[in-house]
Amino acid sequence: MEARDIIIRPVITEKSMNLMSERKYTFIVDKRANKIQIKKAVEDIFGVKVDKVYTMNYKGKPKRMGKYEGRTEAYKKAIVKLTPDSKGIEFFEGLQA
């Protein structure tokens, strides 16, 4: 898997914005990716040093629209903690209030 295939998109919520003060950044990642692959992908794409990676797997929730039943997509979320001497991720810098 390529680095750009592993990181799908950033998570921009109030909670993830509060974590940025602790140098933690949140991403939705490929479900098959492990912590080592996520760490390498973030370091390659953003040019930062990663200290730790926390991952969470979310199952899809059952949803219904009239008589049609389905599920929301399952996904994996990763919180990436940067080392104290590493620079921040530029994409998130403009979002901080």
From Swiss-Prot:
Annotated protein name in UniProt: Large ribosomal subunit protein uL23
GO MF terms held by the record: rRNA binding; structural constituent of ribosome
UniProt keyword annotations, A-Z: Ribonucleoprotein, Ribosomal protein, RNA-binding, rRNA-binding
SUPFAM superfamilies linked: Ribosomal proteins S24e, L23 and L15e
Subunit note: Part of the 50S ribosomal subunit. Contacts protein L29, and trigger factor when it is bound to the ribosome.
Cellular component, GO, one term: ribonucleoprotein complex
Family of the protein in this entry: Belongs to the universal ribosomal protein uL23 family.
Biological processes per GO annotation: translation
Function: One of the early assembly proteins it binds 23S rRNA. One of the proteins that surrounds the polypeptide exit tunnel on the outside of the ribosome. Forms the main docking site for trigger factor binding to the ribosome.
Parts of the chain that traverse the membrane: none
Origin species: Thermoanaerobacter pseudethanolicus (strain ATCC 33223 / 39E)
Coiled coil feature spans: none
